[in-house]
Amino acid sequence: MGRVLQKKKNRSSTPKQKPKRTGQLKSGKKKINVLGNAIIAQNWDRKLTLTQNYRRLGLVHKLNAPTGGSEKRPTKDGRIEELPEDPLHIRGSAKASAKQAAMGETRVERDPETGKIIRVIRDEEEIEIGGRKVKPSNPLNDPLNELSEDEAAQQPASQRANAKSAIVQQLERQADQEGQAVKAKKPRHQSKREEEWIMRLIERHGENYSAMARDRKLNPMQQSEGDLKRRIRKWKANHSS
């Protein structure tokens, strides 16, 4: 029999105290270690916010377009610095995308039966190449071609300075070195015992891989037929010369 007090606790509606979840925020989202990189940790200013630190380092803390609350800094002549919107930002809603649409007149092509708009005809869409109508300024339909070439000149000096800061260059060099290290990684070599095991399988079953996979004595770990094929193919390649 259990104690009466313990039974009352089990029936109580008072929530039990849950163990503290390390690495998780109050909102339930996973806590991200922004100082996981040694270069960023060395240049991180704890007095600044995450957005301010990333802007100072020349990085971006999110790809989505800002929806408000961004900091507007005054320039030397007393005006407010207007940060131009990055055209590569991900739009969060259709309303935000509609605000970017230029107002004007254009021609449309409608379906003669339903009256629905099939396509919008603009002045620069009159060129036809290979049976397809393309823009004269973008015959290959490159989505990045529509970005302004003078975009860098329109940005403020503070943003242009951070575009290729020394920290960004260090991070790029680090990423390049890690990529080269992965490419130069030596492949796994089969051990002597693995080669002896493969030889015993071939001596007993020949090229019958399905029988090898079903063999409980020689294949106690129940390696699959495809895995055995890959191991034997690698063994043959090493012993062919």
Curated annotation (Swiss-Prot):
Compositional bias (Basic and acidic residues) spans? 70-89, 106-122, 209-218
Q: Where is the composition biased (Basic residues)?
A: 230-241
Cellular component, GO annotation: nucleolus; preribosome, large subunit precursor
Residue span of the signal peptide, if any?
none
Name it. Nucleolar protein 16
Protein family: Belongs to the NOP16 family.
Q: Where in the cell is it found?
A: Nucleus, Nucleolus
Origin, by domain of life? Eukaryota
Which source organism? Neosartorya fischeri (strain ATCC 1020 / DSM 3700 / CBS 544.65 / FGSC A1164 / JCM 1740 / NRRL 181 / WB 181)
